[in-house]
Amino acid sequence: MVSIRPDEISSILKQQITDYDQSVSVSNVGTVLQIGDGIARIYGLDQVMAGELLEFEDGTEGIALNLEDDNVGAVLMGEALGVQEGSNVKSTGKIASVPVGEAMKGRVVNPLGQPIDGKGEIPTSDNRLIEEMAPGIIKRRSVHEPMQTGITSIDAMIPVGRGQRELIIGDRQTGKTAIAIDTIINQKGQDVVCVYVAIGQKSASVANVVEVLREKGALDYTVVVSAGASEAAALQYLAPYTGAAIAEHFMYQGKATLVIYDDLTKQAQAYRQMSLLLRRPPGREAYPGDVFYCHSRLLERAAKLSDDMGGGSMTALPIIETQAGDVSAYIPTNVISITDGQIFLSADLFNSGLRPAINVGISVSRVGGAAQTKAIKKIAGTLKLELAQFDELAAFSQFASDLDEATQQQLERGKRLRELLKQAQFSPLNLAEQVAVVYAGVKGLIDEVPVEDVTKFAAELREYLKLNKAEFIEEILKEKKLNEGLETTLTEVIKEVKSSMLATV
């Protein structure tokens, strides 16, 4: 029989008393009452907060949205095949956050910040809450720097500034995404961090966008956030906020950022689906009453920060899809009222061969004018008015047989201006090229060039400047102004290119 040693027992007891941990861990646990359609009703989560992350038994995460007397309504961020009635749910005490930082550049992530591009984990320790308060009035300053899109018709007539929210709106297949991608490509070498958020899109479309960005060397400074059409509604709803959080990290470091939300119509539809399944009362077009707040709190996060805050900026280009050009529907009118202007793309113009198919008459930039460079502002002042008048005259002239000479001349110039503004996809132009092209049209220097040869003339003019007048391009890009000496040089170049071209026609 083993002898009991009192000193050994007492030392063990003393050790256990010393190591005794008095802290009590309390976890708030509930039970799933009902589950289906990406929604779970949970009993027992008494201490949960609105918007809090929940963890289900199988590891699936959810967000508590409806806090009712006897149950909690939560949306699931995943398929949750292992969750069933009676499963346990634990509240985490946290709000959804995503990894941020330099390591995110060049990566494709889901709305939870998890990589989906097959390149392994993202080596970053920085995190940021998906939902953040927008900067207040004192932290902002007015928009004053240009955000060059590389698309002549936008930079000349509907200029966008850093920190602006400019809506791109139009029917399906009118080139909305093309404008956004061109803008990202044009930021190469500008030290701008871009975030492209794809909401409810086909996986093939997103893969195509990523491939184009990679080919053009734009993926190095771009983060792609994708919530595909097959993803849960909760993830499609969260995706834009994730994109904003990733861009905010760079904005508060004093950098310029550009975020594209493609598109917010799908996000609103995902939010409507969630709200109806949570039995929230429907409003106009069955959208919930707070769908305006859903978009306004997102787009208000775009700002140009004051110098005290580092001077960073977040420019937002939200995209909205209309049905048969109806901009008076609920979501389009909401987003138009939140943003600082809109670029309206017309299906009729697109089908007639005008690319980008921008309807100049109803497109507007409410704050971008202050940010426009002096060079383009000087020559493009009358361009928008001339094109808008041309559209009206062209419609009127179909019914009139004899037009006076001034009207005839205005129509002829309008045709040439429209041809000049045609631009191929994925080929953004720099400021000097835009100035040269617009100057030629506005000053009437190409009135003798046949309409069908105007596009060819514009290409030859740009080529001539690159080969023979590199110093002209350099000075415009550096000074961003068009002085008398440069105007004289440009006029001579245009006349020379025109005469050599007309000689061969």
From Swiss-Prot:
EC number in record: 7.1.2.2
Membrane topology note: Peripheral membrane protein
Pfam family, one: ATP-synt_ab
GO cellular component, one term: proton-transporting ATP synthase complex
Catalysis performed (reactions): ATP + H2O + 4 H(+)(in) = ADP + phosphate + 5 H(+)(out)
Alphabetized UniProt keyword annotations: ATP synthesis, ATP-binding, CF(1), Hydrogen ion transport, Ion transport, Membrane, Nucleotide-binding, Thylakoid, Translocase, Transport
PROSITE patterns on file: ATPASE_ALPHA_BETA
Residues marked Required for activity (site): S363
Binding site for ATP: G170, D171, R172, Q173, T174, G175, K176, T177
GO molecular function, one term: ADP binding
Primary location recorded for the protein, binned into one broad class: membrane
Subcellular location: Cellular thylakoid membrane
Classification via Gene3D superfamilies: 2.40.30.20, ATP synthase alpha/beta chain, C-terminal domain (1.20.150.20), P-loop containing nucleotide triphosphate hydrolases (3.40.50.300)
Keyword ATP-binding part of the UniProt annotation: yes
InterPro entries for this protein: ATP_synth_asu-like_sf, ATP_synth_asu_C, ATP_synth_asu_C_sf, ATP_synth_F1_a_nt-bd_dom, ATP_synth_F1_asu, ATPase_a/bsu_AS, ATPase_F1/V1/A1_a/bsu_N, ATPase_F1/V1/A1_a/bsu_N_sf
Family under the similarity heading: Belongs to the ATPase alpha/beta chains family.
Subunit structure: F-type ATPases have 2 components, CF(1) - the catalytic core - and CF(0) - the membrane proton channel. CF(1) has five subunits: alpha(3), beta(3), gamma(1), delta(1), epsilon(1). CF(0) has four main subunits: a(1), b(1), b'(1) and c(9-12).
Protein's job: Produces ATP from ADP in the presence of a proton gradient across the membrane. The alpha chain is a regulatory subunit.
Protein name: ATP synthase subunit alpha
Organism: Prochlorococcus marinus (strain MIT 9515)
